[in-house]
């Protein structure tokens, strides 16, 4: 599942970004660990003061980007379910967070960047009105602080047709890598048993802007 983001080129029109609100109710978008985008046709974030991961389609424009790297025109933007790492409930983990299987899809949106682990997963969906519950848990092994586990609770909706979901997890509760790149190990229960994958991970660099 280690993947370089296909969105790393600012001139690609569809990208995975972090929508970051700033002090004056405006926002910018973080394209990857080092590239920022200024949306010239949207002054206020559609997600208010929430920081979220999102899929965006944009065109670069030849306008001033101020303190940001590139000015862009947003054609459409769609947020991804964005969650913190879940709390450890001990003996209740299986009951609450579930043990239902998923397959992880190895594509350009499955990536660890900008302090998030974004995942495309596939599972069975029978009742489209039944919400599934997905979470990320930290390892209980103190010697493996960069090990996390994906959990899925289908609430009994385990038959039907395969379909994909997207989720992004904020990794800020993991230990600071202090500028180093480490291996982040993801564990999950697949339809073929327990599986793991590794991602290159570095704690998010501080990027703070107060105005556009």
What are these regions (language model features)?
Residues 1-7, 11, 209-211:
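Single conserved hydrophobic/aromatic residue that forms the stacking wall/gate
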Residues 13-212:
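First exposed extracellular module after export/assembly in secreted or surface-exposed proteins
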